[in-house]
Amino acid sequence: MFPMVTGFMSYGQQTIRATRYIGQSFITTLSHTNRLPITIHYPYEKSITPERFRGRIHFEFDKCIACEVCVRVCPIDLPVVDWRFEKDIKRKQLLNYSIDFGVCIFCGNCVEYCPTSCLSMTEEYELSTYDRHELNYNQIALSRLPISIMEDYTIQTIRNSTKSKIDEDKSSNSRTITDY
């Protein structure tokens, strides 16, 4: 055949293929129109974390035996465990424990392999700071209990204000019957 005719045929095939791809993507876009929105208004609405969410690590100083298993199983050797050997009781005494959350990958190995369960993952995910050195948590900061999402003051006020609006709407729409 002539090269010009084959060129037009391949151009026509490419045009049909491109139209098919655009049509498929348009159908995909239209299939998402009936779904609920996923975006939340972050400071006022907080996402509910799943059951095994890996957030900030909680540390219980009294349970730790300074075995350093958490350091050995960590892929980046992150936890810093300072201890000294007490000769009179023949055991290690923990002096300091710290984790730098700026480097932590939240894999959960330290929590999973801890023999005394002194480490646990919390649902706390708000670790933003202006200085990366503030992400280095010592044992005091790690032992701080997490703030639950439902106990947050801003969330409670928003939830209560919407309930009061709903209650007002119900009371204005309902009739009251009084006995005389």
Swiss-Prot record:
Q: Which Pfam families match?
A: Fer4_7
Cofactor annotation: [4Fe-4S] cluster
Q: Which UniProt keywords apply?
A: 4Fe-4S, Chloroplast, Iron, Iron-sulfur, Membrane, Metal-binding, NAD, NADP, Plastid, Plastoquinone, Quinone, Repeat, Thylakoid, Translocase
Q: How does it sit in the membrane?
A: Peripheral membrane protein
Report the co-factor binding details. Answer: Binds 2 [4Fe-4S] clusters per subunit.
Catalytic activity, EC: 7.1.1.-
Entry binding sites for [4Fe-4S] cluster 1: 64, 67, 70, 114
Q: Which amino acid positions bind [4Fe-4S] cluster 2, per UniProt?
A: 74, 104, 107, 110
Origin, by domain of life?
Eukaryota
Q: Read off the HAMAP family from this record.
A: NDH1_NuoI
Quaternary structure, per UniProt, is: NDH is composed of at least 16 different subunits, 5 of which are encoded in the nucleus.
Official protein name in the record: NAD(P)H-quinone oxidoreductase subunit I, chloroplastic
Organism, scientific name: Agrostis stolonifera
